[in-house]
Amino acid sequence: MIRPAVAAAALVALASCKPSLQPPGDAGVCYHLATDAPGKTHFNVVARSVPDMEHCAADLEGMRLRFLSLGGANAEITGAYQGNFLFLGDEGVFTSDSFDGARYPFLVHSGNQLVPPGAAEP
């Protein structure tokens, strides 16, 4: 009697697991994460031959600001560069190796520039 209950609980637990979103790992390619419908996402190429994550963040920030200047309501966007997620918003750019994981400050706003967190003037 206990075995079927344990088996049923295990099946329910496995059914609730969903694969986590993985960022593309292509070298030198900057991506924007687009959401088509609830639960449907894909990565759009923003730029190729991007030398580093800072340049990708700058490209994504430029795209974010252009969207806002055209009347867009979403102040936060997500991108990816070489297997890392980039989360951009009014506070700056945060990075993580997983979509749902801890996000670490990467670049912050200082005036109209993005700078490393320790370089920003108070």
Sequence positions of predicted segments:
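Sec-dependent bacterial lipoprotein signal peptides
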Residues: 1-18
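Mitochondrial intermembrane space
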Residues: 18-122
